[in-house]
Amino acid sequence: MDNKAARLRRATRARKQIKELGANRLVVHRTPRHIYAQLIAPNGSEVLAAASTAEKSVREGLKSTGNVDAAKVVGKTIAERAIEKGVKNVSFDRSGFKYHGRVAALADAAREAGLQF
């Protein structure tokens, strides 16, 4: 099994457990160039908030969009947008990625900005 298939298998297993909880999901996806975060409703059919380094407003002031500093900005932005929508408690869905580096930086920044998970 290649790395991508293994990651997707881990992600599917984690999503199944999160759906049973019935909580809002903070989903993270990373590529070498960008990092994306979405806040998805418990039913899975509605995106409540989103932020990524592909957005011009987030990208301003960043030297690079594929590093830990950029992930921190995305984490802070998604937390602010979630709180505007009235969401404070979420389940963190790392999409099978290791909780390390950019994924961990995004999560820590979101926690510092007021999200609870």
Curated annotation (Swiss-Prot):
Domain of life: Bacteria
PANTHER family per the UniProt record, alphabetical: 39S RIBOSOMAL PROTEIN L18, MITOCHONDRIAL, LARGE RIBOSOMAL SUBUNIT PROTEIN UL18M
GO biological process, any: translation
HAMAP family: Ribosomal_uL18_B
Pfam families in the cross-refs: Ribosomal_L18p
Name of the molecule in the record: Large ribosomal subunit protein uL18
Stated role: This is one of the proteins that bind and probably mediate the attachment of the 5S RNA into the large ribosomal subunit, where it forms part of the central protuberance.
InterPro entries to which the protein is assigned, alphabetical: Ribosomal_uL18_bac-type, Ribosomal_uL18_bac/euk
Entry keyword rRNA-binding: yes
GO cellular component: cytosolic large ribosomal subunit
UniProtKB keywords: Ribonucleoprotein, Ribosomal protein, RNA-binding, rRNA-binding
GO molecular function, one term: 5S rRNA binding
Matches recorded under Gene3D superfamilies: 3.30.420.100
Keyword rRNA-binding (UniProt): yes
